[in-house]
């Protein structure tokens, strides 16, 4: 279900979700599914058509299955102004990256 938000609210939500993802609190698939459903209010079929991939590939990404190429991941996140990149595996390093101080 699409939630009506201002541009500022959407940006704030996106930043919070990205922080959760970097800290390992939500998966890449969970992030994408939340954005697709709650920000855009789109079905998998319509979103897959929008970004130019198959619905099956989108399902696999949202369920954290398979091993998609970086280009595919970049395609599915592009409508949100996000691309894939390297991120620390260890939570304390991710926290340092986000906050700028060691814990």
Describe the residue ranges of each PLM region.
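The alpha-helix within a helix-turn-helix
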Residues: 36-37, 48, 77
């Amino acid at each position: 279900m699409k939630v009506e938000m201002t541009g500022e609210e959407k940006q704030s939500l996106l930043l919070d979700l990205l922080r959760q993802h970097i800290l390992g609190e939500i998966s890449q698939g969970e992030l994408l599914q939340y954005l697709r459903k709650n920000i855009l209010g789109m079905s998998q079929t319509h979103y897959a058509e929008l970004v130019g991939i198959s619905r099956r590939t989108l399902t696999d990404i949202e369920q954290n299955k398979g091993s998609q190429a970086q280009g595919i991941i970049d395609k599915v996140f592009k409508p949100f102004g996000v691309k894939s990149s390297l991120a620390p595996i260890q939570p304390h390093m991710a926290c340092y990256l986000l906050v700028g101080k060691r814990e």
